[in-house]
């Protein structure tokens, strides 16, 4: 199938992917722009996995204070080069992720950051809530509830507040695919007036 330049341009504007990647995705999806976006998102996740081991020593720390002055967030986002760290897209994503932390109160950056004892404690609570169910059903329910816990407690697993069709990790993977660099949120701290650390 021959893909028009207008369609390639539209997909590029939507995703920020390269011309050739957009053309290939549109050919693979037979001109369906929604499928092409999904293809590019999957490619972004694959690219992110390849780049995950690379050192991220550059980056920025952003501060967000909610308009009422009662909630504040400091967030560090890293990349490989200062060139990427200075781009508007990188800075905007970091700032929006600080807003995400302010609004959604994650406790961890990634699911790998959740201590094993916290996971075991959550599992105990879930098992106690459903102890009357058959054993083979209990494990499936516990896994489902644990997945929900990760979606609430881990920044990367949360639904993005500005686009509920994506998770935070999808946005980071898209930026990794676009820049060709490893990008990650290293840490954040959320403050709320009246809350103890």
UniProtKB/Swiss-Prot annotation:
Primary localization class, coarse: cytoplasm
A Gene Ontology molecular function term of the record? translation elongation factor activity
Where are the annotated segments for Involved in Mg(2+) ion dislocation from EF-Tu? Answer: 81-84
Q: Which PROSITE patterns match?
A: EF_TS_1, EF_TS_2
InterPro entries, A to Z = EF-Ts_dimer_sf, Transl_elong_EFTs/EF1B, Transl_elong_EFTs/EF1B_dimer, Transl_elong_Ts_CS, UBA-like_sf
Q: Which Gene3D superfamilies match?
A: 1.10.286.20, DNA helicase RuvA subunit, C-terminal domain, Elongation factor Ts, dimerisation domain
Q: Does the keyword Protein biosynthesis apply?
A: yes
Compartments where found: Cytoplasm
**Gene Ontology cellular component?**
cytoplasm
Which N-terminal residues, if any, form the signal peptide? none
Q: Does this UniProt record's set of keywords contain Protein biosynthesis?
A: yes
The protein's UniProt keywords, in alphabetical order, are: Cytoplasm, Elongation factor, Protein biosynthesis
According to its UniProt entry, the function of this protein is described as: Associates with the EF-Tu.GDP complex and induces the exchange of GDP to GTP. It remains bound to the aminoacyl-tRNA.EF-Tu.GTP complex up to the GTP hydrolysis stage on the ribosome.
Q: Which family does it belong to?
A: Belongs to the EF-Ts family.
Name of the protein described by the UniProt record: Elongation factor Ts
Organism of derivation: Thermotoga neapolitana (strain ATCC 49049 / DSM 4359 / NBRC 107923 / NS-E)
> Taxonomic classification, please?
Bacteria, Thermotogati, Thermotogota, Thermotogae, Thermotogales
């Amino acid at each position: 199938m021959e893909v028009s330049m207008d369609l390639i341009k539209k997909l590029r504007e939507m995703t920020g992917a390269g011309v050739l990647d957009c053309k290939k995705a549109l050919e693979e999806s037979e001109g369906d722009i929604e499928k092409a976006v999904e293809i590019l998102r999957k490619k972004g996740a694959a690219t992110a996995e390849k780049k995950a081991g690379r050192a991220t020593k550059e980056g920025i720390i952003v501060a967000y204070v909610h308009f009422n002055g009662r909630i504040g967030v400091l967030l560090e986002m890293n990349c490989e080069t200062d060139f990427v760290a200075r781009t508007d897209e990188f800075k905007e994503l970091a700032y929006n992720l600080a807003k995400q932390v302010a609004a959604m109160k994650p406790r961890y950056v990634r699911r790998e950051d959740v201590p094993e004892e916290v996971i075991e404690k959550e599992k105990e609570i879930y098992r106690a809530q459903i102890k009357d169910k058959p054993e083979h059903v209990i494990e499936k329910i516990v896994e489902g509830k644990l997945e929900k816990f990760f979606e609430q407690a881990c920044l990367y697993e949360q639904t993005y507040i500005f686009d509920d069709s994506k998770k935070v990790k999808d946005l980071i993977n898209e930026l990794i695919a676009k820049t060709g660099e490893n990008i990650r949120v290293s840490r954040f701290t959320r403050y709320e007036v009246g809350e103890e650390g």
